[in-house]
Structure formats: structure tokens, C-alpha cells
Amino acid sequence: MNPAEHDEAVSQFCAMTRARPDEAQEYLATNGWDLEAAVTEFFAEQDETAGSSEPTGQPSAKSSSSTPRESSSSRKQPPKKFATLGDLASGAADSSDDDDDENQDFFAGGEKSGLAVQNPDDLKKKIIEKARRTQLPASDDSEPRRNYFTGPARTLGGEDTPSRVIDTPSGPAQPQIPRRVRRTLHFWADGFSVDDGELYRSDDPQNAEILNSIRQGRAPLSIMNAQHGQDVDVEIKQHDEKYVRPKPKYQPFAGKGQRLGSPTPGIRAPAPSEPAPAPQSSSGPPKPNVDESQPVVTLQIRLGDGTRLTSRFNTTHTIGDVYDFVSAASPQSQARPWVLLTTFPSKELTDKAAVLGDLPEFKRGGVVVQKWQ
């Protein structure tokens, strides 16, 4: 390769790994200027560094913290602004020795067995410190391209060629990769919470294990609301005050509704055809006794189930006669309490002795509505 090709390979290596030019030249020279092999070796060494085990935290480990820890693969990376769970895991081993003399452990267990749990407040400080030293890498994940045209197809035919249907090609279903999600980790004076969730108190040793998992780059599925194998970006927010339960978010079109056309809710039933003023038949509802020689008014009655009835009454009939007619016409009215009322303005008709001709709403007929109680 000529010098121009070498410079091009170094530029591509730096763009893919964010390494310095001298590091890129070293990896490329080691792998015979094979760009793919050099990049593979670079990321493999980064994974080995991130997966290194943490010290046990014993007092004897304090002396070993003075020994050089930098290897040929742990090269200085450009400063970052945000942190992911993987970045927190890669920096966990580097800072554990420095904090051994400040760790305060909790102990949980019985008389003959116990478990040492690290202080949650100390874990919160470590997570925040590593988030300040790192940044979120540029996401290479792109949303899967949506196919808007699915299903069978049909070809256009002509005079000599008929149209034909092309079925959907059957192939192996591709596994769907869950999309990267973002969660907000809130640190409060008395614990921590995720997004708008409940408080995890600092004095609970079990919650310290959750923080330790986050510090090591593992997202607990129980509190992160994520799927197995799903990438999670964690944004850290620190609060000086104690936990305050967030107010519920306003959701429009939530709760119960009431259908239009009736002052009472109910299930709309198909409205039967209005009976014509004809002699009573055995199939229709019972009709009140009407004296044709006396003034007659027509009342439209809207039942609570949506059914509409029309009946003729004399002006000498009472509200009680209307109650009797509704009770006889609707079997459902005999099983639950109800009341009749007028419309616009709505007023309950509780005086069953009132005469229709004496009520201004019914002197010339009107509408009566049944309301369930």
C-alpha cells in the first residue's frame, strides 16, 4: 500500500473507533494494514477491558492499588459527556480500589449466615461520578424500515393476458430486535426511582444490589421495564430533596362517557316503529282508556333503555296513569326503581295526582323521559 492508502486507512479506523491516529496506525501495522482485522482487534480488547472482574474490596486490596493497572489495550479515549450502562461497567473496576477506604457495608441475613451489601449512598456517588466522566456514544441503531405494502398482489391483465394474483412470499420470520429505550434514574435524598415509578429506599439492603447491577452495566428488568437483551440508555438526575410522588399525567378522553340523545346512560336498542293510533292489539303495549269525546293529548315516552313509545291520553288523566302505562309497557321497569321527568328544563314528575291538563308542559302533549335510579 502506498502512503495515500495508509492515510485513508488511518482515517477510516479513527472514524469507526474514535481512536487517535497513532493508535490507529499501530493497530493497522500489527494486522498488516487490514482495516477489518484491526477494527476487530480494537473492539475485542475494549470488550476484554470492560469485562474485567472487580476487586473483592478486602482491606488487603488497598496496597495493590498502587501497582500500574494500564495495559497495552487500555488506551486513553476521548472525553465523553453522557454514560450508558456499558460505560458504567467499564469504569467500575478502575474506581473500586480508590473507594475501598470509604465503603460502608450493610449486612443482611440470619444468625449463622450473612450477606454484606455496599452502602447505597456510596453506590450513587460512584454512578454519578462515572456518568460525569463518560458520554453516550453515537447510536448506530436505525429504525427498521417499515414495509407499507404487504399482502398478496394482483397483476394488471390485458386483452390476451388475464390478471393473476401473486401470493405473499412465505419465508422465515425475521426476529424483531427490540428498540433502544431511554430511562431516567432519579437520585433522591432518601433513595432512588426510575422515571415516574415508586421510591426505592436507601436503607433497604436489597435496593443496594439493584444499584450495584446498574453500576456494573446490567439493567434490572423489574425496574427498568425492558425486555431481555434490549439496550437501555440511562439518564441520571440528582435531587437534593426527598422523594416526592409525581402527579399523574393528564390523559385526555379518559374515564366514563355518556351517549348523546338521552339524559341517562344506557345501551341503545333499535327504536321500533311508532304505533299508529289504532285499536289495541295483543302484540303491542296496553293502551290507556281514552275518551274520544274529551280533549286528547299525545305523549312521547323515552324509556331508559332507549326505546321510544307514543301514547294518547285525555287531559283528565294524571301523572300516575302515565307511570302505570310505562310500568306495563316495559318489563324492565318492574325490576328496578325509576322516575319520570320532563325535558328542557328537566324536572322530576313526583306528584302522581297531578292532572295532565293542569300542567303547562302537557296541555298540548309533550315528551316524558324515564330515568333509572
UniProtKB/Swiss-Prot annotation:
<dbReference type="GO" id="GO:0061025">
    <property type="term" value="P:membrane fusion"/>
</dbReference>
<dbReference type="InterPro" id="IPR001012">
    <property type="entry name" value="UBX_dom"/>
</dbReference>
<dbReference type="GO" id="GO:0043130">
    <property type="term" value="F:ubiquitin binding"/>
</dbReference>
<dbReference type="GO" id="GO:0000045">
    <property type="term" value="P:autophagosome assembly"/>
</dbReference>
<feature type="compositionally biased region" description="Basic and acidic residues">
    <location>
        <begin position="121"/>
        <end position="132"/>
    </location>
</feature>
<feature type="domain" description="SEP">
    <location>
        <begin position="185"/>
        <end position="258"/>
    </location>
</feature>
<feature type="region of interest" description="Disordered">
    <location>
        <begin position="39"/>
        <end position="179"/>
    </location>
</feature>
<dbReference type="GO" id="GO:0007030">
    <property type="term" value="P:Golgi organization"/>
</dbReference>
<dbReference type="Pfam" id="PF00789">
    <property type="entry name" value="UBX"/>
</dbReference>
<feature type="domain" description="UBX">
    <location>
        <begin position="292"/>
        <end position="369"/>
    </location>
</feature>
<dbReference type="InterPro" id="IPR012989">
    <property type="entry name" value="SEP_domain"/>
</dbReference>
<dbReference type="Pfam" id="PF14555">
    <property type="entry name" value="UBA_4"/>
</dbReference>
<feature type="compositionally biased region" description="Acidic residues">
    <location>
        <begin position="95"/>
        <end position="104"/>
    </location>
</feature>
<comment type="function">
    <text>Involved in CDC48-dependent protein degradation through the ubiquitin/proteasome pathway.</text>
</comment>
<dbReference type="GO" id="GO:0005634">
    <property type="term" value="C:nucleus"/>
</dbReference>
<dbReference type="InterPro" id="IPR029071">
    <property type="entry name" value="Ubiquitin-like_domsf"/>
</dbReference>
<dbReference type="InterPro" id="IPR036241">
    <property type="entry name" value="NSFL1C_SEP_dom_sf"/>
</dbReference>
<feature type="compositionally biased region" description="Polar residues">
    <location>
        <begin position="49"/>
        <end position="59"/>
    </location>
</feature>
<protein>
    <recommendedName>
        <fullName>UBX domain-containing protein 1</fullName>
    </recommendedName>
</protein>
<feature type="region of interest" description="Disordered">
    <location>
        <begin position="236"/>
        <end position="293"/>
    </location>
</feature>
<keyword id="KW-0833">Ubl conjugation pathway</keyword>
<feature type="compositionally biased region" description="Low complexity">
    <location>
        <begin position="85"/>
        <end position="94"/>
    </location>
</feature>
<dbReference type="InterPro" id="IPR009060">
    <property type="entry name" value="UBA-like_sf"/>
</dbReference>
<dbReference type="GO" id="GO:0031468">
    <property type="term" value="P:nuclear membrane reassembly"/>
</dbReference>
<dbReference type="GO" id="GO:0043161">
    <property type="term" value="P:proteasome-mediated ubiquitin-dependent protein catabolic process"/>
</dbReference>
<dbReference type="GO" id="GO:0005829">
    <property type="term" value="C:cytosol"/>
</dbReference>
<feature type="compositionally biased region" description="Low complexity">
    <location>
        <begin position="60"/>
        <end position="71"/>
    </location>
</feature>
<dbReference type="Pfam" id="PF08059">
    <property type="entry name" value="SEP"/>
</dbReference>
